[in-house]
Amino acid sequence: MTTTRSLVIEKELPHPLEKVWRALTQGPLIKEWLMDNDFQPVVGHKFNFRSTPMPNWNGVIDSEVLIVEPNKKLSYSWSSLGLQSVVVWTLVATSGGTLVRMEQSGFQPDQTREYQGANYGWQKFFEGLQRVTAGLT
């Protein structure tokens, strides 16, 4: 049996849960902090994240919405370059705002480079999520 790895990032954002949820589930807002997309918060919806193509990568991440629990949990598949993973966002209201937990699971033992790249990328994306959420009214 192959054991997979998960990447987990947790940060408390000083914003109400509803604002964070909007930034996670509205396509134009997702584009501002993550990538261009055709996301819709509907279970079963197949969509793509699109970024600038690079050598050996067409810039497309194939995804499907798996879970939508408004203001609580969002999950979608994340398939690109041989990585078949699942991203789960969990939101919990705190006295200071919202605890945001992102887990990307499914990294195979030989996907160390992909794991490290995802860790770097999600740190940057969280910065963008914070910025976009701060700008919401």
Model segments located where?
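Hydrophobic-ligand binding "helix-grip"
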Residues: D38, K46-N48, P53-R101, S105-F107
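Residues at helix-coil transition
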Residues: T25-Q26, P70, E127, A134
